[in-house]
Amino acid sequence: MKNITILGATGSIGTQTLDVIRREKEELKLVAISANKSYKKVIEIIKEFKPKYAVLMEENAFKIVEDFCIDNKIDTKVLKGMEGMIYISTLEEVNTVVTSVVGMIGLVPTIKAIESGKDIALANKETLVVAGELVISKAKEHNVNILPVDSEHGAIFQCLRGNKKEEVKNIIVTASGGPFRGKKKEELIDVKPEHALKHPKWNMGRKISIDSATLMNKGLEVIEAHFLFGVDYENIKVVVHPQSIVHSMVEYKDGSVIAQMATPDMKLPIQYALNYPNRKESQIEPLDFYKISNLTFEKPDMDTFLPLKLAYEAGKKGGVMPAILNGANEVAVDLFLKGKIEFLQIGDLLQECMNKFYKSMEATLENVISVDKEVREYLGKKYDI
């Protein structure tokens, strides 16, 4: 039996993780959850799974859930804030922590979980983007597995198994292309949030949907792949594959390419990470090769989708630059969703902050938190938020 903590249990990945646990009750047990403020969903999770702990970040939501548990004589202990997230990430009885919260908020609990010897099922891209070197070194120090939950890195992880790192020529990360695949810059001038939120293949949260539309999501995945697999940026390629059947590939020095293919369903990489190193029966629809008419691959347009280009630049620059990129992007996406900036301004703001805030500093926990705060405060004042 594996005991699981889910950070971000009410979001897209968290909800699908619950689906996997629901199907595998004999092997997986939910011990603790966290959420921001979705108290209704948290109450439903508590009623069904009866976790020992539930953490709410927002004060009012915390009080509502706490009162519910007291009134209904439910044993779930309700905690709040970052202190609560760290607590449930370091519980002695927990084997694996699923980090599916969005943004920088996942960084400290993930590091604390690693230091406590927990395997990490990682769906929070920002953790590796801003502090990849630190996270990977701590994972090695504490003999912890970092198991990627997203479809691309989960695919790469599987394609690398049983092979030697020195035999790898290129890692090829596939991208659906998002809702604006094939569009040119001039066609994206009047894009509104409702257009950008309509992803052609995946049902995701609002922030990651916008990142997919700008291709920043793929840029973050490139940086993540660099740290996860120790491959230089020159050897990490992005290929647009609109069918989303091939989830990523590894090209070897002898010319062989190993690809991981499956019906697009996030439950598969989640299930793989939670059951690693074993494989379990899955409920997802199997591929029918007689029905797959064609698989196409295209080069990404980095001039139109500037954030992808900037992610490569930030990764190669190293140090705190990825943290600057990430902090600026989190704020820029929020500004776009609130109608305060245009779609194409997201890339412009990333470029502005990278130019303004870069310092030649090591990406220590203190440094990345500090520069992230600077970026957020600057953009907050600029746009009065």
Swiss-Prot record:
Top-rank taxon: Bacteria
Cofactor(s) demanded: Mg(2+); Mn(2+)
Reaction(s) catalysed by this chain's protein: 2-C-methyl-D-erythritol 4-phosphate + NADP(+) = 1-deoxy-D-xylulose 5-phosphate + NADPH + H(+)
InterPro entries: DXP_reductoisomerase, DXP_reductoisomerase_C, DXP_reductoisomerase_N, DXPR_C, DXPR_C_sf, NAD(P)-bd_dom_sf
EC class name: oxidoreductase
Pfam short name (any one): DXP_redisom_C
SUPFAM superfamilies tied to this protein: 1-deoxy-D-xylulose-5-phosphate reductoisomerase, C-terminal domain, Glyceraldehyde-3-phosphate dehydrogenase-like, C-terminal domain, NAD(P)-binding Rossmann-fold domains
Any GO MF annotation of the entry: manganese ion binding
EC number: 1.1.1.267
Amino-acid positions noted as binding 1-deoxy-D-xylulose 5-phosphate in the UniProt annotation, renumbered to this chain: K125, S151, E152, S176, H199, S212, N217, K218, E221
Biological process annotations from GO: isopentenyl diphosphate biosynthetic process, methylerythritol 4-phosphate pathway involved in terpenoid biosynthetic process
Binding site for NADPH: T10, G11, S12, I13, K37, N124, E126, G205
UniProt: Mn(2+) binding residues: D150, E152, E221
Pathway: Isoprenoid biosynthesis; isopentenyl diphosphate biosynthesis via DXP pathway; isopentenyl diphosphate from 1-deoxy-D-xylulose 5-phosphate: step 1/6
UniProt keyword list: Isoprene biosynthesis, Manganese, Metal-binding, NADP, Oxidoreductase
Its biological purpose: Catalyzes the NADPH-dependent rearrangement and reduction of 1-deoxy-D-xylulose-5-phosphate (DXP) to 2-C-methyl-D-erythritol 4-phosphate (MEP).
Family per similarity comment: Belongs to the DXR family.
Name this protein carries in UniProt: 1-deoxy-D-xylulose 5-phosphate reductoisomerase
Species this protein is from: Clostridium botulinum (strain Kyoto / Type A2)
